[in-house]
Every structure is written in structure tokens, then in C-alpha cells.
Amino acid sequence: MNLKLLFVISNDEKTLNRLINKFTLPFNTLMHGDGTASQGILDFLGLHKTKKNILMSIISSYDEDGIEKFIREESKIPEIGKGVAFTTPLSSSPKYIEEAYKERVGDNMKNKSPYHLIITIVKEGNAEKVMNTAKKNGANGGTLLKGRGIGGKNSFKFFNMTVEPEKDVILIVCKDNDKNKIMKAILDKNGANTDSQGICFSLPIDMTIGIDE
């Protein structure tokens, strides 16, 4: 079953909702996060601290080209600094999700982009340290996610991992040849044996929009 995880990071929530409705995406999560551009850059551009909407949705490869076309033609994401969008392959998924897409899924996987998504989870308040380390080793920026409990619980699920509310989740898209250097630096400076108590892992990315365009 050829399913992928779509990430769209943008401050345009209306366009994200249009995307969900147009392609009838049944399995999606819309969250809020903060961009990590430095305050000096934001001041120079006359901008306030960047607030972002993060859409995560499971899609089939059958829909990927249409979704990419929609984002490129009907959103501002391709414009510099307006957001990013990318997909990453899913190695496994629940049977009910596979059944929902069964009749629409293509057979061939495509890997069109030499990028990776680095996901870092650290104690709350340490995200800036992670981004400073990452930028010194080739990263251009990232997105900070703030989790909150659902249904009375004080933790939330991210990639099937339980993340406590006092944790920050940082998403960084980087070039393949920078991935190992960035991850090693993050783990050295902000890993499990440091005050940040961090972990990080990476996922390959397929389609990308808003990255080096």
C-alpha cells in the first residue's frame, strides 16, 4: 500500500482547509506552531514572530501530483518565506487507513527530492538551542510544535510516540548531505545526556514546495 505523510506549514489556514476539502483527506491533523527565524531577521523585514499552521495528513500517491499542483497554483507557499510543503513515505499504516485508500493507490514509489525531515524532541524551552546548533551546521530554519493534552491527558502523540507537555518538537527540513552533520551536532549539544534531554530522528522526503525554489 503506497501511502505518504503530507506536511504543509503555512500561516494560511483557509487554504489548508480548502486543500482538505478538495481532496477529501480523511486522516489529517491541523496544529499551530512557531517559525524559528531569528528576531533580527524578522525586525529587518518588519514582521512579528511567525505563527504557523501545520497540517499533517495521510495521502495516497494517487493524489500526490494533484495536491502538489493545488499548492503551487492556489496558495502562496511557493513564494519565498510563505511556508513549505513536503511528503514522506509511510513504511506501515493501520489496516483501516489502507482500506480507505485501497482503490485509489498507485503502485510505484517516487523519490523526487534530495531532502530529509529531522524531528527533534527536547525539554520545553530548549528549542532555540537546537535551532542555533542546527543553523551552525547547515540548516536554514525550522518549525516549533507545542503539544497539549487531549481528553484530559497531559501528553500527546507524535509519530506514535508519547510526548509530554513540557517538551518541544522541532521540525527541520535539510539537504541530504547536511543531515548527518546536523543530527550529530544536535545530539552532541542537546542529546539525552545534556540538560535538553533531546532525541532526534529523520525521515526521507519526496515532494517539496517552498524549499530552495
PLM features per residue range, with description:
Residues 1-213:
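Positively charged, small/polar-rich N-terminal and surface patches that mediate targeting and assembly
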